[in-house]
Swiss-Prot record:
UniProt-annotated location(s): Cell inner membrane
InterPro entries: GlcNAc_MurG (IPR006009), Glyco_trans_28_C (IPR007235), GlycoTrans_28_N (IPR004276)
Keywords: Cell cycle, Cell division, Cell inner membrane, Cell membrane, Cell shape, Cell wall biogenesis/degradation, Glycosyltransferase, Membrane, Peptidoglycan synthesis, Transferase
Main localization category: membrane
A Pfam family recorded for this sequence: Glyco_tran_28_C
Family the entry assigns: Belongs to the glycosyltransferase 28 family. MurG subfamily.
Protein name: UDP-N-acetylglucosamine--N-acetylmuramyl-(pentapeptide) pyrophosphoryl-undecaprenol N-acetylglucosamine transferase
Entry membrane topology: Peripheral membrane protein
Binding site for UDP-N-acetyl-alpha-D-glucosamine: T11, G12, G13, N124, R165, S192, I246, Q291
Stated role: Cell wall formation. Catalyzes the transfer of a GlcNAc subunit on undecaprenyl-pyrophosphoryl-MurNAc-pentapeptide (lipid intermediate I) to form undecaprenyl-pyrophosphoryl-MurNAc-(pentapeptide)GlcNAc (lipid intermediate II).
A GO cellular component annotation in the UniProt record: plasma membrane
Catalytic activity: di-trans,octa-cis-undecaprenyl diphospho-N-acetyl-alpha-D-muramoyl-L-alanyl-D-glutamyl-meso-2,6-diaminopimeloyl-D-alanyl-D-alanine + UDP-N-acetyl-alpha-D-glucosamine = di-trans,octa-cis-undecaprenyl diphospho-[N-acetyl-alpha-D-glucosaminyl-(1->4)]-N-acetyl-alpha-D-muramoyl-L-alanyl-D-glutamyl-meso-2,6-diaminopimeloyl-D-alanyl-D-alanine + UDP + H(+)
Top-level taxon of origin: Bacteria
Length: 365
């Protein structure tokens, strides 16, 4: 493998699995050039740069649900496909792998138009539109969850798991040092972009958490950081660590006893690999409610508790969190259940699949 393009964008749920595969490729093939192709308007350019990857941006945005703005988005998609097509000619990839999102639509379609081998990876239990369309033009579809097997042609599918970055795999392989019973640590994450409903629920819970001696590490998202930071200061919660974005999420997982977060596919996969008990609050407006489906995968196995956003106001959130953090035996059982669902080998399985695909797929020149 000499040159590979990974294409996706929009949210960390698409981006981080791509970065995990990039890590695996570079570990196995140090001379291989990996190019990240994403959108111009999301966090992917910054995240790719932090991972040491070259980046090409495409002027693509979502088309569905944008009303009159869909016209401009459609022109942007056409321009994105044209730019991706030109990049394919210059970079000359051996293979292209898409991880969903509109940038992946442009990138994978351009690869197929150029006659380059291509594959896609679906993270969620309910497939997104991009991958449902692209599955018709690629020979291989990598899946994260068995629930998705019936959504694509069976001869194309490979159940590989959702790739997780090596630092998180290492976190899961190491058992946390035993802590005194009075030490209780809550990690709060609303995804790469934050989650206002989760942020507000935690702020309302701060007095009770402080009284119970709970330490909090809180990822707010950039838009909410200043407001939530002030709320912590006003409530006098001296044990709170508030950040817009946590760069070293593996260290955060290793630190935490319990995680309160959304139920994006990548978050769910990371929780499983890291072996972390969780309270999951699915984003209620996700396409096809896929976050609720993702959450139920862990909840049904005893690794997480489901808290629907519509029920937050009617739920005693402080009692729920403190109750879980005070029950060390239950947390341990949840951790074991989570770890049993993890696929720490997912990135390796995807790269194995790409290598096999290269052996069997003719490449146009």
């Amino acid at each position: 493998m000499r040159r590979v393009i990974l294409t996706t964008g929009g949210t960390g749920g698409h981006i981080f699995p791509a970065l995990a595969v990039a890590e695996e490729i570079r570990a196995r093939y140090p001379e291989c050039s990996v190019l990240f192709m994403g959108g111009l308007y999301g966090p992917e350019a910054d995240l790719a740069a932090r991972a040491g990857l070259d980046f090409v941006g495409l002027p693509v945005r979502g088309v569905l649900g944008r009303g009159v703005r869909a016209i401009g988005a459609a022109f942007g998609m056409a321009a994105g496909i044209a730019r991706a097509y030109a990049v394919m000619g210059r970079f000359d990839p051996d293979i292209v792998l898409g991880f969903g999102g509109y940038a992946a639509f442009a990138g994978v379609l351009a690869a197929r138009l150029r006659g380059r081998p291509a594959a896609i990876h679906e993270q969620n239990s309910v497939p997104g539109l991009t991958n449902r369309v692209l599955s018709r033009v690629v020979p291989r579809v990598f899946l994260s969850l068995p629930d998705t097997l019936g959504a694509f042609p069976p001869q194309k599918t490979c159940l590989a798991g959702n790739p997780v970055r090596a630092s998180i795999v290492a976190c899961g392989a190491e058992r946390s040092d035993p802590r005194p019973d009075h030490v209780r640590r809550l990690l709060v994450m609303g995804g790469s972009l934050g989650a206002r409903a989760i942020n507000d629920a935690v702020v309302s819970s701060l007095p009770a958490l402080a009284e119970a001696g709970v330490e909090v590490w809180h990822q707010t998202g950039a838009a909410d950081w200043e407001r939530i930071r002030k709320a912590y200061a006003e409530t006098g919660h001296g044990e709170g660590r508030v950040e817009a974005f946590i760069d070293d999420v593996a260290s955060a997982y290793a630190w935490a006893d319990l995680v309160l977060c959304r139920a994006g596919a990548t978050s769910v996969a990371e929780l499983a690999v890291a072996g972390k008990p969780a309270v999951l609050v699915p984003y209620p407006f996700a396409t096809h409610d896929h976050q609720t489906h993702n959450a139920r995968w862990l909840v049904s196995r005893g690794a997480a508790v489901l808290l629907e956003q519509k029920d937050i106001s009617m739920t005693d959130v402080p009692a729920l969190l403190v109750g879980l953090l005070s029950d060390r035996a239950r947390l341990n059982r949840m951790a074991v259940s989570a770890r049993a669902q993890g696929r720490p080998d997912a990135a390796a399985a995807v790269v194995d699949g790409l290598v096999e695909l290269l052996k069997t797929t003719p490449r146009a020149r």
